[in-house]
Amino acid sequence: MPKLKTNRAAAKRFKFTKNNKIKRKSMNTRHILTKKGPKRRRRLRGLTLVNNSDWKSIVRLMPYGVR
């Protein structure tokens, strides 16, 4: 059986944690930040976890990311 290819777009956007949860960057942080308050911008700064319902589809894109 041939090697599976990793989707490069997904590999750049997602990282796996030690417990196989998936981290992603928060959305709404690219532009038009002037109308967003400082508290909201601070909250959006960090990484968040991907929802469990999306986990399976992301794992299919990154077959070697899961431990």
From Swiss-Prot:
GO terms for biological process: translation. Coiled coil: none annotated. InterPro entries: Ribosomal_bL35, Ribosomal_bL35-like, Ribosomal_bL35_CS, Ribosomal_bL35_sf. Keywords: Ribonucleoprotein, Ribosomal protein. GO terms for molecular function: structural constituent of ribosome. It comes from the Bacteria. Belongs to the bacterial ribosomal protein bL35 family. PANTHER family: 54S RIBOSOMAL PROTEIN BL35M, LARGE RIBOSOMAL SUBUNIT PROTEIN BL35M. This is Large ribosomal subunit protein bL35. It comes from Leptospira borgpetersenii serovar Hardjo-bovis (strain JB197). The gene is rpmI.
